[in-house]
UniProtKB/Swiss-Prot annotation:
This is Fructose-bisphosphate aldolase 8, cytosolic. The gene is FBA8. Disulfide bonds: none annotated. The modification N-acetylserine is found at S2. The modification N6,N6,N6-trimethyllysine is found at K354. S-glutathionylated at Cys-68 and Cys-173. S-nitrosylated at Cys-173. It catalyses: beta-D-fructose 1,6-bisphosphate = D-glyceraldehyde 3-phosphate + dihydroxyacetone phosphate. GO terms for cellular component: apoplast; chloroplast; cytosol; mitochondrial envelope; mitochondrial outer membrane; mitochondrion; nucleolus; plant-type cell wall. The lineage of its organism: Eukaryota, Viridiplantae, Streptophyta, Embryophyta, Tracheophyta. Keywords: Acetylation, Cytoplasm, Glutathionylation, Glycolysis, Lyase, Membrane, Methylation, Mitochondrion, Mitochondrion outer membrane, Phosphoprotein, S-nitrosylation, Schiff base.
Length: 358
């Protein structure tokens, strides 16, 4: 049997293509309450609902930012939240031409029988939740699987388990009208070289697309959110051109042309690094049947967060910092970023957190 055809097939295909529009990308603002608490703590702001809402309102109403975006990933709390003047965030995004998305996984747990590898929870009741999220205005979803590189990792067991979970999630989303973002993140932690990362990335993506095929997922109505192929965090850095070459080659070998767009995660790179690497990929003269874009969280928000510091009088400057990063990444999706963005506070600092939990 070929791809499963849901009653939403045409809508899924149109929305996936829209999210992949060159010149646009995704703002990942789906941090769990615990994770956003750590971000707020870094600027000495208390983790209460009002402050979380204030930060998200700052992001979603920043002048000039929304035209650079095609989607924003929300945490469940934010899907139902309103701005200070009583307007649903979902409506603010839609009016700005941005599709709302929703994080649907329930985090990772250790995979029994492995050396600290993980699997992602959240399949129980997923169909009902997707239906509810669609009714609330969400049009795409995200599920993060996490793999690590070690002497014997990732194991075949971990690769298979995570690929299967992603495929199961993807088909359930499509049954309920949500475009699934398939995110198999290979953590940057370690001292491995770029060749090792490339080999592991190819193995993981090949397994994911085999699982998606086995589950009859409509590839035209999906997006891929992979890591860039880079050396490990404890290894010497390489140039954006080298990262671009290894990343695009790994994708050419594994990602079917039916997939409309690949939206990279930033994986703890600095804001500027992530943008330069994406730009280098789009400048590569080679076969790329999918658009290459971004789905950045930390790499879009860091300088904004530092500029804001929880103070009302800093909102305008913080929104300007967000616009600068959105514009830079918009240009990077077209391969036209000149590296001339005004670097905000924190734009050049590494955002790597070992064993990162979202």
């Amino acid at each position: 049997m070929s791809a499963f055809t849901s009653k939403f097939a045409d809508e899924l295909i149109a929305n996936a293509a829209y999210i992949g529009t060159p010149g646009k990308g995704i703002l990942a603002a789906d941090e769990s309450t615990g994770t956003i608490g750590k971000r707020l703590a870094s600027i000495n702001v208390e983790n209460v609902e009002t402050n979380r809402r204030n930060l998200r309102e700052l992001l979603f109403t920043a002048p000039g930012a929304l035209p650079c975006l095609s989607g924003v990933i929300l945490f469940e709390e934010t899907l139902y939240q309103k701005s200070s003047d009583g307007k649903l965030f979902v409506d603010i995004l839609k009016e700005g031409g941005v599709l709302p998305g929703i994080k649907v996984d329930k985090g990772t747990v250790e995979l029994a029988g492995t050396d600290g590898e993980t699997t992602t929870q959240g399949l129980d009741g997923l169909g009902d939740r997707c239906k509810k999220y669609y009714e609330a205005g969400a049009r795409f979803a995200k599920w993060r699987a996490v793999l690590k590189i070690g002497e014997n990792e990732p194991s075949e067991h971990s690769i298979h388990e995570n690929a299967y979970g992603l495929a199961r999630y993807a088909v359930i989303c499509q049954e309920n009208g949500l475009v699934p973002i398939v995110e198999p993140e290979i953590l940057v932690d370690g001292s491995h070289d770029i060749q090792k990362c490339a080999a592991v990335t190819e193995r993981v993506l090949a397994a994911c697309y085999k699982a998606l095929s086995d589950h009859h997922v409509l590839l035209e109505g999906t997006l891929l959110k992979p890591n860039m192929v880079t050396p490990g965090s404890d290894s010497p850095k390489v140039s954006p051109e080298v990262i671009a070459e290894h990343t695009v080659r790994a994708l050419q070998r594994t990602v079917p042309a039916a997939v409309p767009a690949i939206v990279f995660l930033s994986g703890g790179q600095s804001e500027e690094e992530a943008t330069r690497n994406l730009n280098a990929m789009n400048q590569l003269k080679t076969k790329k049947p999918w658009s290459l874009s971004f789905s950045f969280g930390r790499a879009l928000q860091q300088s904004t967060l530092k500029t804001w510091a929880g103070k009302e009088e800093n909102v305008k400057a913080a929104q300007e910092a967000l616009y600068v990063r959105c514009k830079a990444n918009s240009e990077a999706t077209l391969g036209t970023y000149k590296g001339d963005a005004k670097l905000g506070d924190g734009a050049a600092e590494s955002l790597h957190v070992k064993d990162y939990k979202y």
